Regions:
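Short, solvent-exposed aromatic-acidic interface loops
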Residues: 82-86
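Basic, Lys/Arg-enriched alpha-helical interface segments
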Residues: 1-63, 72-77, 87-90
């Protein structure tokens, strides 16, 4: 089982959504899959990123609610960012 490392920016991003139950539940589902090293279902549109986030993965937790993570060595996944397209890329 992998461990999750929360970046400082991820923690800040998460605070914006901490009261949104639906988004938090969907996020928990994806985080559980990541920790258990299971594939992210196609409904979340998982894909590799390039540019500023080269080497990271992204998926759509719910609509325009995105998670960016980096699968590090030593069984650690770094949660990099959380938010909308405009918040993350714009």
């Amino acid at each position: 089982m992998k461990r999750l490392f929360l970046s400082t920016q991820y923690k800040k991003d998460y605070k914006k959504y901490k009261n949104d139950f639906k988004k938090k539940e969907a996020l928990k589902e994806v985080l559980k899959l990541l920790k258990e090293e299971k594939p992210i279902p196609a409904k979340f549109l998982p894909h590799m990123l390039h540019g500023e986030y080269k080497g990271c993965m992204e998926c759509h937790i719910q609509g325009d609610f995105l998670l960016i993570w980096f699968d590090k060595v030593n069984d650690i996944i770094e949660l990099v960012r959380l938010g909308s397209h405009s918040e993350l890329f714009g």
